[in-house]
UniProtKB/Swiss-Prot annotation:
GO terms, molecular function: rRNA binding; structural constituent of ribosome
UniProt name for this protein: Small ribosomal subunit protein uS5
UniProt organism field: Frankia alni (strain DSM 45986 / CECT 9034 / ACN14a)
Alphabetical list of PANTHER family matching this protein: MITOCHONDRIAL RIBOSOMAL PROTEIN S5 (PTHR48277:SF1)
Assembly notes: Part of the 30S ribosomal subunit. Contacts proteins S4 and S8.
C-alpha cells in the first residue's frame, strides 16, 4: 500500500509541474504587439547566364499605433520571407510622430521623387481620409483623424516615403513657439490650450 501512495504522490507532483509549466509559459510568450501593413508586393527578375531568376519584394509599414512607425523594404525568393525582411527593416527605422490627441499638430507636406503628400489636422471623429499607402502609414503611427491628398506619382513606394517625409517634418507646438520666439498661445491649436487649461495635458 505505501508503494501505491508514493506512485500517486509522484503523479500529483508531475501534474503540478505540468500546470506550472503551462502557466509559466504565458508571460514569456507575451511580446510587444506591432501593427503591420503590407503595402505592395512585386515580382522581380534578374537575368543571368542560365536564364532569369525570380524573386519577390515587399514594402511593409510597421508601428505600435501609438506614435511610432517605420517603413521597410524586403527582398527574397518567397513572399513570406520578403515580408519578414521588410518587417525587420521597418523596425530598424522607427521614429516618433508628434501628435495632438488623435490628429497631427499642423498641416505638412512631404515629397519623395515625383510623389507629394499633403496632410492636414482633422477634428475628432473625422477618421483617416486617405488612400491605401498613406492610410497604412497613418494607422500604424496611431493618427486616427487626418485629411490627406496625394499628388504626382501613384507609385506606392513614392507615396509611402512621401508620407514618412511629411510625418518627419511635424513639430510639436512647443518646438514651433521656441523657434519663432512666440508664446505657446499664439501657435498651439485651441483644443490643446483648452485641454491644458482643464488640467488634462496633451
Amino acid at each position: 500500500m505505501p508503494g501505491q501512495q508514493r506512485r500517486g504522490g509522484g503523479s500529483g507532483g508531475s501534474d503540478r509541474r505540468e500546470r506550472r509549466d503551462r502557466s509559466g509559459g504565458g508571460p514569456a510568450q507575451e511580446k510587444n504587439a506591432y501593427v503591420e501593413r503590407v503595402v505592395a508586393i512585386n515580382r522581380v527578375a534578374k537575368v543571368v547566364k542560365g536564364g532569369r531568376r525570380f524573386s519577390f519584394t515587399a514594402l511593409v509599414v510597421v508601428g505600435d499605433a501609438d506614435g511610432t512607425v517605420g517603413v521597410g523594404y524586403g527582398k527574397a525568393k518567397e513572399v513570406p520571407a520578403a515580408i519578414a525582411k521588410g518587417v525587420e527593416e521597418a523596425k530598424k527605422h522607427f521614429f516618433k510622430v508628434p501628435r495632438i490627441g488623435s490628429t497631427i499638430p499642423h498641416p505638412v507636406q512631404g515629397e519623395e521623387a515625383a510623389g507629394v503628400v499633403l496632410l492636414k489636422p482633422a477634428s475628432p471623429g473625422t477618421g483617416v481620409i486617405a488612400g491605401g499607402p498613406v492610410r497604412a502609414v497613418l494607422e500604424c503611427a496611431g493618427v486616427h483623424d487626418v485629411l490627406s491628398k496625394s499628388l504626382g506619382s501613384s507609385n506606392p513606394i513614392n507615396i509611402v516615403h512621401a508620407t514618412v517625409a511629411a510625418l518627419r517634418g511635424l513639430m510639436r507646438p512647443e518646438e514651433i513657439a521656441a523657434r519663432r520666439g512666440l508664446p505657446l498661445e499664439d501657435v498651439a491649436p485651441p483644443a490643446m490650450l483648452r485641454a491644458r487649461a482643464a488640467g488634462a495635458g496633451v
